[in-house]
Regions:
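A C-terminal functional module that forms or caps the active site or interfaces directly
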Residues: 6, 177-231
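Active-site cofactor/substrate anionic-group-binding motifs, chiefly glycine-
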Residues: 4-54
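Glycine-rich, Lys/Arg-enriched anion-binding loops that position phosphate/diphosphate groups
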Residues: 115-182, 189-190, 201
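Active-site glycine-rich loop that binds ribose-phosphate moieties when present
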Residues: 57-66, 85, 91-106, 113-119, ...
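General beta-strand structural signal in soluble alpha/beta enzymes
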Residues: 1-7, 24-27, 45-48, 76-80, ...
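A generic, well-ordered mixed alpha/beta core segment in the N-terminal half of proteins
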Residues: 37-79
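Residue-level detector of conserved catalytic or cofactor/ligand-binding positions
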Residues: 232-238
Length: 239
């Protein structure tokens, strides 16, 4: 029934450019907030107000204040998967796709990345000239993805490439053939000559992958990587 399917930033941009004045955003709270920030004159409706992303709340005003007091030359970099309140307290907002580029361009030596520590560690590896201060937030799906199950999936599907989201811990990312945002994973699968992929991210992406790449096979870990707290209903993924 959706007119558009995609990640939060893509859909927020679609909402901003759409001629319609009312947007129905089927997603979690921070997604609707992001759409409203980019489209302040439009009405944004959320069908499930209790659908929420726990990670979006895993930073505090007090924590940000303490870091600003301790470091003079610090930029608070906020992941888009955060509440509007946290975005307001930050210096810049990034996506997983553009975070490395933006952090590299910042004049600040010290970077306080909120709320996700795994994405922060991934960015820090790409930008070694910066000093990162880590927040202890995490995605409840990616954080608990079992690296042993990823290994088992690779053994079960030896021809498959592993595509992982940078919100995954290092134990998973080290096994990946390619690391990217949700949109990056989809594009890689579309462009690749490979026919099989193990997907290390929330399995809601399966629909988009299978509809855009009907001739390819996608596998997930034995423990289904689904965000139950988001209340988004999906079908059982292929293992």
């Amino acid at each position: 029934v959706a007119d558009y399917i995609g990640d939060s930033f893509y859909l927020s941009k679609i909402a901003a450019s759409a001629k319609e004045k009312t947007i129905v955003f089927c997603g979690v709270g921070f997604m609707g907030e992001s759409a409203k920030i980019l489209s302040p004159d439009k009405t944004v409706l959320m069908p499930a107000m209790d659908a929420d992303c726990p990670m979006a709340h895993m930073a505090t005003e007090e924590g940000i204040r303490k870091v600003r007091e301790e470091y003079d030359d610090v930029a608070v970099v906020c992941y888009i998967n955060s509440t509007a309140a946290l975005k307001e307290l930050s210096d810049v907002c990034v996506t997983s796709a553009n975070a490395v580029k933006i952090v590299k361009a910042l004049p600040n030596k010290n970077i306080f990345f909120i709320p996700d520590r795994n994405l922060a560690h991934f960015i820090a590896e790409q930008v070694p000239e910066k000093h990162f201060i880590y927040n202890e937030g995490f995605c409840i799906v990616h954080e608990f993805m079992d690296p042993e199950e990823v290994k088992e999936a690779k053994e079960a599907h030896p021809e498959a490439l592993v595509l992982a989201h940078p919100e995954c811990p290092q134990t998973v990312l080290k096994q990946a053939d390619y690391i990217a945002s949700t949109s990056g994973i989809i594009k890689y699968a579309q462009d690749s000559n490979n026919k099989e992929f193990i997907i290390c991210t929330e399995c809601g992406v399966q629909y988009k992958l299978e509809t855009t790449c009907p001739d390819k096979k996608f596998y997930f870990t034995e423990t289904v990587p689904v965000c139950k707290l988001s209340l988004i209903h999906i079908s059982e993924p292929t293992r």
